[in-house]
């Protein structure tokens, strides 16, 4: 795709796993930057924006202010943004402080990209964002840095779906 900036991990870093679906996303239990285990299923029934990213990924860093603004603007409409970071807890914690991230950031390794691949990220690039409607169905996907207007469009569609 021309003009899309992403960061990709070398293919040898992506591990094989069983078939993943939206249920596999909800089944994830990952630590947050403070080491507390968080179940993605706690956000079931809300519009869930799962953003796969890394601290070393420039396009990921570029989209963060728009994601922070979207969380603030859309929270009252039942939207929850969750960042799934591919990095160490310390780096993610420092990033959250420096960028004033106001939504949950979870910590994982590159194996979580298998879930992203089965949710439509065949390129394995970052950032990758999946929007799930309240019923758990995929409402939207985006590979590359999101702009505010793109996020708002994805969320308007997802919140309108029953």
What are these model-derived regions, one by one?
Residues 97-103, 108-156:
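Thiol/disulfide oxidoreductase modules built on the thioredoxin-like
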């Amino acid at each position: 795709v021309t003009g899309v900036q992403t960061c990709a991990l070398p293919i040898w870093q992506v591990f094989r796993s069983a078939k993943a679906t939206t249920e596999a996303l909800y089944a994830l239990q990952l630590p947050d930057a403070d080491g507390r285990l968080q179940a993605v299923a706690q956000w079931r029934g809300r519009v869930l924006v799962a953003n796969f990213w890394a601290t070393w990924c420039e396009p990921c860093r570029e989209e963060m202010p728009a994601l922070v603004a979207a969380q603030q603007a859309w929270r009252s409409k039942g939207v929850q943004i969750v960042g799934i970071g591919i990095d160490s807890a310390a780096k993610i914690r420092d990033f959250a402080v420096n960028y004033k991230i106001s939504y949950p950031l979870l910590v994982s390794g590159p194996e979580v990209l298998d879930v992203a691949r089965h949710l439509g990220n065949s390129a394995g690039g970052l950032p990758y964002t999946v929007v799930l409607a309240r019923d758990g169905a995929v409402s939207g996907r985006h590979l590359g840095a999101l702009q505010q207007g793109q996020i708002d469009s994805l969320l308007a569609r997802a919140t309108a779906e029953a």
